[in-house]
Design a protein with these regions (language model features):
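Short, surface-exposed linear segments at secondary-structure transitions and domain or protein termini
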Residues: 49-52, 66-71, 120-130
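Intrinsically disordered, low-complexity Pro/Gly/Ser/Thr-rich segments with frequent PxxP/GP/PP motifs
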Residues: 62-88
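Short acidic, flexible loop segments centered on an aromatic residue
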Residues: 40-54
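Short, solvent-exposed loop/turn segments enriched in Ser/Thr/Gly
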Residues: 21-27, 94-96
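Extracellularly exposed regions in secreted/surface proteins, prominently low-complexity, repeat-rich
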Residues: 80, 87-88, 93-141
Length: 141
């Protein structure tokens, strides 16, 4: 019987930036590291944090109006969510360089910490609050 994927069964990663039209675009990826098939549905929880684990930016928003498919993950398969925000170099807002991105799978309360290598992000929420999309099958477009 298929069940929802648990944090302990998943590995997390963040893809490289694919910038466009003043936006920074990253793929938040969850990969099934277990020996059983499971599924994810919905949005990731994400938080930019410093070296102590304290949040350094406003909470990202969920993209509205997007379908939330159930993504079946066989062992080794991945699902990805698009995380988009305005390029801080263009908006001129104050910034911070996070140490990590905490990724929480849908309907879970335990996060996976991934080292952040994507550079500066706005720490004010004034120009652009990051948005995340629902998970889709695959490891990114």
């Amino acid at each position: 019987m298929r069940r929802r994927c648990r944090t302990s069964e998943l590995r997390a990663s963040v893809g490289g930036n694919h910038p466009g039209a003043g936006q920074s675009n990253f793929a938040v990826v969850l990969t099934n590291g277990s020996r059983r098939t499971c599924w994810v549905r919905g949005f990731p929880g994400v938080a930019f944090v410093d070296g102590r684990g304290d949040a350094v930016t406003p909470d990202p928003e969920r993209a509205r109006g997007e379908e939330q498919p159930t993504v079946t993950l066989t062992p080794g398969a991945s699902a990805w969510s698009a995380m988009t925000f305005a390029n801080p170099a263009i908006t001129g807002v104050t910034t911070v360089t996070p140490a990590a991105l905490l990724i929480t799978p849908p309907d879970e309360t335990t996060s996976i910490s991934v080292r952040w290598t994507g550079g500066e992000v706005s720490n004010t929420g004034k120009a652009s609050v990051p948005q995340v999309s629902p998970f889709r099958a695959g490891d990114a477009p």
